A protein has these predicted regions:
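Extended, charged helical/alpha-beta scaffold domains that provide interaction surfaces
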Residues: 1-195
Length: 195
């Protein structure tokens, strides 16, 4: 039975190590970063401008604060403009603006390859930090899951379900931390003076 608990962590470890391998092999992470940006914008739009609520009830201020915290360069339309769109239109517009903001960030670098290297370093650091936290969290979950047994629930099923949710939260946190860091990087230009 302990092997089945270990199997859950092994599956998650394989996913994380594969991602680390891609980074360490020097693959361009550009598409990965763009996916992280668009997924983050989608998640925030779903959270603050739900299709289940009328546009007048959308929390545009909350959406703006959360997007701006991670992507400071992303400008939202006015609340009135946001509420005049469908959620799909708003999402599309914000994803376009998020991607454009990153293209502008890329243009701040003298060479695109410099940003590619920064992306790899940032992604690796964030993955490693979040993965270490996740290992600790999964260990605590495993220790605490035995208490679930009295509730006529299968502890292994509970561990798998909760562990899967926690893994999803970790991958979302990796994406959010990565793009936040990349959008907040300041590029310093060396100025050569003529003598």
């Amino acid at each position: 039975n302990l092997l089945e608990y270990d199997q859950v962590m092994n599956e998650q470890r394989e996913i994380i190590y594969e991602e680390r391998r891609r980074v360490l092999d020097g693959e361009s992470m550009r598409d990965t970063i763009y996916s992280m940006i668009t997924e983050y914008v989608e998640n925030m739009t779903d959270r603050f401008a739900s299709t289940e609520a009328d546009p007048e009830e959308w929390d545009i201020k909350g959406l703006d604060v959360n997007l701006h915290n991670v992507i400071p360069q992303l400008q939202l339309p006015s609340e009135k403009e946001c509420q005049s769109m469908s959620q799909k239109e708003l999402k599309h517009l914000l994803k376009e603006r998020g991607v454009k903001a990153y293209e502008n960030k890329e243009a701040e670098f003298p060479e695109a390859e410099q940003l590619r290297e920064v992306e790899r370093v940032v992604l690796l650091k964030v993955i490693d930090a979040r993965w270490m936290d996740h290992i600790d969290d999964m260990d605590q979950l495993r220790q605490g899951i035995g208490l679930q047994a009295y509730g006529q629930r299968d502890p292994l099923v509970e561990y798998k379900m909760t562990g899967y949710e926690m893994f999803g939260e970790m991958t979302n946190a990796i994406a959010e931390n990565t793009i936040r860091t990349l959008f907040h990087i300041k590029v310093e230009q060396k100025v050569e003076r003529e003598e």
